[in-house]
């Protein structure tokens, strides 16, 4: 028989058994991250470096400051150039550092115009009027 006389050795009771309805752990629901950033490097083949800027409060002064983080994203067609604005879509791990797909976004002003205004009648009439 083993004598447990040391103060450093303790015996804890076994964990309670799982019930039949609690056999699986609770599902963890997370919001999908929609990241938007600017392409800063295109040196590697099929990979772009994207810098994402977010605002976060300073721990001591509580003023919001810009936090920059750089992500590697998959660009299968090598279609992006430095300065392009892209959206990062989460995907399965493609390599050690690539966990996102780069998706093109239209320039900011064109996206806004198409959402706010209906097409003009002058835009519909592309042909010059020929009244003779």
Curated annotation (Swiss-Prot):
Listed GO CC annotations: chloroplast; ribonucleoprotein complex; ribosome
Pfam families per record: Ribosomal_S17 (PF00366)
An MF annotation (GO) of this entry: rRNA binding
Residue span of the annotated presequence: 1-31
Bias type Acidic residues, positions: 122-132
Oligomer status and interactors: Part of the 30S ribosomal subunit.
Function: One of the primary rRNA binding proteins, it binds specifically to the 5'-end of 16S ribosomal RNA. In the hcf60 mutation the Activator tag is inserted 17 base pars upstream of the initiation codon. This mutation is seedling lethal, due to plastid ribosome insufficiency. However under non-light stressed conditions photosynthesis and oxygen evolution can occur.
Protein name: Small ribosomal subunit protein uS17c
Gene that encodes the chain: RPS17
């Amino acid at each position: 028989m083993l004598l447990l006389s040391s103060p450093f050795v303790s015996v804890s009771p076994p964990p309670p058994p799982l019930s039949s309805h609690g056999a699986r752990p609770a599902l963890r629901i997370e919001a999908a991250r929609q990241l938007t950033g600017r392409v800063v490097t295109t040196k590697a083949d099929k990979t772009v470096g994207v810098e994402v800027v977010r605002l976060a409060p300073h721990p001591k002064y509580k003023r919001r400051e810009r936090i920059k983080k750089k992500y590697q994203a998959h660009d299968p067609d090598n279609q992006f150039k430095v300065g392009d604005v892209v959206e990062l879509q989460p995907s399965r791990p493609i390599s050690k550092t690539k966990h996102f797909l780069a998706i093109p976004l239209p320039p900011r002003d064109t996206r806004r115009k198409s959402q706010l205004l209906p097409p003009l009648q002058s835009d519909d009439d592309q042909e010059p009027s020929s009244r003779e």
